[in-house]
């Protein structure tokens, strides 16, 4: 099964997507939380053996530096004019946000003009159509990456688990469907609650995408950071 997720245009685009979920001014976001979400996303891509561009890894190292500085006790700076990497990053994000808004406005104008001169290209955008409440597959993937990061922390504190490599998507689809034997909806947390390995979580996530693709389940999230609900499709 091919994994086709919406690509971000670069690390700043990914960060802006994460920041926008807080619906506050860029300079007011909880930066450590955003950094942890970014790092979880990169770690999940690597766990799924997906290629991660060098620029994303470079940004990850910069974010780890900012995170470590934020977690250290606050002290009076002996050199107040020293560059602040966090403020530099937030300034870059704000500049990128303004640029992106302008680019989208220009693109919309171009599309409006194109309607009068050419027949629009027919496309089926799977990732932006299958989830409800304006959520995309990428939003679901970001939520999953945070869950996997938390699950790995839990597993690392428990007994050693031997990785099993022969999980099958078809089997995991059945596992998910069992959650709907006695009810019409469940949560993402409930679906992944019994996972014991990273491979199991990844295969279960791919099985969920396949069920969505087959219109057997729908995924809902009423607001940013709220529970993700899986609902059985009515026949």
UniProtKB/Swiss-Prot annotation:
Role description: Participates in chromosomal partition during cell division. May act via the formation of a condensin-like complex containing Smc and ScpB that pull DNA away from mid-cell into both cell halves.
Name of the protein this chain belongs to: Segregation and condensation protein A
Intracellular or extracellular location(s): Cytoplasm
Organism: Streptococcus agalactiae serotype V (strain ATCC BAA-611 / 2603 V/R)
Cross-referenced InterPro entries: ScpA
GO CC term (a single one): cytoplasm
Gene Ontology process terms (BP): cell division; chromosome segregation; DNA replication
Sequence similarity: Belongs to the ScpA family.
Subunit structure, as described in the record: Component of a cohesin-like complex composed of ScpA, ScpB and the Smc homodimer, in which ScpA and ScpB bind to the head domain of Smc. The presence of the three proteins is required for the association of the complex with DNA.
One of the Pfam families matching this protein, by short name: SMC_ScpA
Keywords annotated in UniProt: Cell cycle, Cell division, Chromosome partition, Cytoplasm
């Amino acid at each position: 099964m091919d994994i086709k997720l919406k690509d971000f245009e670069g690390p700043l685009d990914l960060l802006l997507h994460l920041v926008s979920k807080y619906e506050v001014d860029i300079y007011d976001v909880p930066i450590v939380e955003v950094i942890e979400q970014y790092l979880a996303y990169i770690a999940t891509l690597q766990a799924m053996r997906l290629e991660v561009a060098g620029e994303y890894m470079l940004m990850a190292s910069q974010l780890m530096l900012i995170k470590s500085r934020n977690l250290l006790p606050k002290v009076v700076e002996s050199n107040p004019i020293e560059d602040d990497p966090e403020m530099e990053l937030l300034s870059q994000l704000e500049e990128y946000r303004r640029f992106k808004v302008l680019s989208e406005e220009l693109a919309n104008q171009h599309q409006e003009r194109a309607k009068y001169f050419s027949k629009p290209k027919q496309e089926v955008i799977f990732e932006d159509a299958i989830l409800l409440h304006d959520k995309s597959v990428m939003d679901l993937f970001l939520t999953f990456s945070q869950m996997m990061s938390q699950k790995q922390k839990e597993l690392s504190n428990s007994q050693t688990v031997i990785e099993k490599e022969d999980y099958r998507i078809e089997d995991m689809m059945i596992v998910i469907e069992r959650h709907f034997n006695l009810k019409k909806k469940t949560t993402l947390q409930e679906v992944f609650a019994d996972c014991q390995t990273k491979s199991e979580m990844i295969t279960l996530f791919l099985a969920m995408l396949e069920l969505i693709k087959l219109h057997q389940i729908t995924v809902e999230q009423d607001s940013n950071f709220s529970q993700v609900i899986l609902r059985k499709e009515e026949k």
